[in-house]
């Protein structure tokens, strides 16, 4: 690998002939860059923004070797399972066509659409298999079916992983600086910090990214992409367009009401799952977690700001995406090994790993955490290399006045 600076952005991207490996960490890590692991004195208050007393090599060494093995047959079995459930749910709901059944169908099918997204996400990381062609074909089928441009999103998600925890360079649910926050118009603030509206943000993010950033996941000349990625982006946008055309045709064949019930409402449930899960993996801990700039940022320190979450019965359905810390540090580990890899890494991570609150059958406990974070986490300081979220005390009074 070699680092190459994007001509349109100050952030750095990994340059490799194999795009699947662009979202990973080096196979060998210099273990001399950090001091040996030492036990923290019990009387010392833990500072989550302090450099950790371990490095990536220490964590990697603790993870069993078999956790890195990708089994394409096992990965494909999950695809077959999820697609079978999706079609069975749609067929059952259409056959029964009962208003007592439809709400249950919407929740179940929306959750399954989200499960399809996670499998496509694994294809984008290359953790689905070692075959880039298989990853690309399966990823396009899964993501296009739920109106996600596979390569466009894969590339922006690569940027997210390579810059996780960096105030300016992170891509997903990154904090706004106070200057950018204050430059937002009132409708944008209302949308961004009001539930449930903010949980519907994903399609708008695909079209126009986040406040303070420019470009689109659909346009090959976007700031998100390098010139060599143009054909990939065009391919995914074409697949997205083909799916959109198919949905329009089905609308004429089946009728708009049937399409609304079978696809449109589950699609938006899927969007809410996606925003809910991805937001809480980077926000909402009871103690404020740091965000970094400049020399204070490193791949390891940024990755340690992510959070694991327990989703109860949903853990298995959405492929243990809640085991997020190890996934962020080592995205090449297949999802079916993440729980074991996390357990093995915990002794090394120590207090830098934050044990998630245990969920009941459904992750209802996370709703209060989400609401609290949306209310309190608005922006970070324009200055400083280690910063924490701050709240705008006037935001909701301003929103109320605007609404009236």
UniProtKB/Swiss-Prot annotation:
Superkingdom of the organism of origin: Eukaryota
Keywords, in A-Z order: Chloroplast, Fatty acid biosynthesis, Fatty acid metabolism, Lipid biosynthesis, Lipid metabolism, Membrane, Oxidoreductase, Plastid, Transit peptide
Annotated spans, Disordered: 28-50
Motif (Histidine box-3): 324-328
EC number of this enzyme: 1.14.19.-
GO CC terms: chloroplast membrane
Record bears the keyword Oxidoreductase: yes
TM helices/strands, residue ranges: none
Membrane topology per record: Peripheral membrane protein
UniProt pathway: Lipid metabolism; polyunsaturated fatty acid biosynthesis
Motif Histidine box-1: positions: 121-125
Pfam families, per database record: DUF3474, FA_desaturase
Biological process, per Gene Ontology: unsaturated fatty acid biosynthetic process
InterPro entries: FA_desaturase_dom, FAS_N, Fatty_acid_desaturase
Biological function: Chloroplast omega-3 fatty acid desaturase introduces the third double bond in the biosynthesis of 16:3 and 18:3 fatty acids, important constituents of plant membranes. It is thought to use ferredoxin as an electron donor and to act on fatty acids esterified to galactolipids, sulfolipids and phosphatidylglycerol.
Domain notes: The histidine box domains may contain the active site and/or be involved in metal ion binding.
Family: Belongs to the fatty acid desaturase type 1 family.
Name the UniProt record assigns to this protein: Omega-3 fatty acid desaturase, chloroplastic
Provenance organism: Brassica napus (Rape)
């Amino acid at each position: 690998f070699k680092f190459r600076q994007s001509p349109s952005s100050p952030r750095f991207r990994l340059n490799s002939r194999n795009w699947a490996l662009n979202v990973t960490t080096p196979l060998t890590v210099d273990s001399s860059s950090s001091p040996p692991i030492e036990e923290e004195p019990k009387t010392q208050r833990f500072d989550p923004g302090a450099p950790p007393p371990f490095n990536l090599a220490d964590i990697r060494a603790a993870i069993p070797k078999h956790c890195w093995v990708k089994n394409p047959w096992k990965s494909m079995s999950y695809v077959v399972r999820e697609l079978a459930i999706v079609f069975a749910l749609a067929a059952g709901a259409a056959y029964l066509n009962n208003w007592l059944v439809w709400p249950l169908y919407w929740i179940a099918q929306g959750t399954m659409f989200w499960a399809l997204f996670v499998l496509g996400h694994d294809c984008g990381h290359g953790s689905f298999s070692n075959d880039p062609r298989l990853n690309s074909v399966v990823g396009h089928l899964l993501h296009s079916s739920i109106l996600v441009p596979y390569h466009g999103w894969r590339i922006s998600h690569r940027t997210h992983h390579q810059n996780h925890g960096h105030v300016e360079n992170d891509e997903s649910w990154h904090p706004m600086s106070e200057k950018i926050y204050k430059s937002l118009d009132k409708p944008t603030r209302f949308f961004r910090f009001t539930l449930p509206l903010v949980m519907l943000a994903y399609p708008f993010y695909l079209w126009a990214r986040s406040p303070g950033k420019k470009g689109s996941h659909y346009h090959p000349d976007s700031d998100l992409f390098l010139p060599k990625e143009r054909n990939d982006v065009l391919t995914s946008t074409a697949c997205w367009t083909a799916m959109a055309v198919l949905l329009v045709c089905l609308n004429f064949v089946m009728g708009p009401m049937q399409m609304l019930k079978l696809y449109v409402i589950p699609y938006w449930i899927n969007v809410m799952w996606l925003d809910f899960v991805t937001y809480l993996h980077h926000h909402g801990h009871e103690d404020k977690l740091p965000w970094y700039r400049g020399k204070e940022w490193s791949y390891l320190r940024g990755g340690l700001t992510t959070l694991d979450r327990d989703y109860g019965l949903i853990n298995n359905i959405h492929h243990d995406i809640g085991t997020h810390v190890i996934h962020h540090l080592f995205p090449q580990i297949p999802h079916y090994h993440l729980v074991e890899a996390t357990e093995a890494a915990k002794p090394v991570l120590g207090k830098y790993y934050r044990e998630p609150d245990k969920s009941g059958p459904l992750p209802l406990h996370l709703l209060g955490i989400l609401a609290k974070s949306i209310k309190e986490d608005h922006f970070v300081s324009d200055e400083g290399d280690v910063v924490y979220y701050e709240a705008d005390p006037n935001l909701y009074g301003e929103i109320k006045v605007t609404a009236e």
